[in-house]
């Protein structure tokens, strides 16, 4: 488990139900939002964002 911060140039980071860009969006996290990284695999982080568990692309999270 690691702490991270959302780092997007525009809009929000989509938190998805599965590690796929076609998966359903379960939450959206704004730039600078704190996020907890639970696991990482194949370019995706499994995260807890405000109590919602889902997947985000690892390129848009800066680990702290």
Can you name each region flagged by the protein language model?
Residues 32, 45-49:
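SH3/SH3-like beta-barrel fold
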Residues 1-14, 27-31, 38-41, 58, ...:
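SH3-family beta-barrel domains
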Residues 19-24:
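Short alpha-helix capping/helix-loop boundary micro-motifs
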Residues 48-59:
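Short, compositionally biased
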């Amino acid at each position: 488990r690691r702490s991270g911060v959302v780092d997007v140039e525009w809009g929000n980071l989509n938190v998805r139900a599965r590690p796929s860009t076609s998966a359903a969006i379960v939450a959206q996290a704004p730039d600078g939002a704190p996020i907890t990284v639970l696991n990482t695999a194949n370019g995706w982080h499994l995260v807890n964002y405000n109590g919602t568990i889902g997947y985000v692309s690892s390129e848009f999270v800066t680990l702290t």
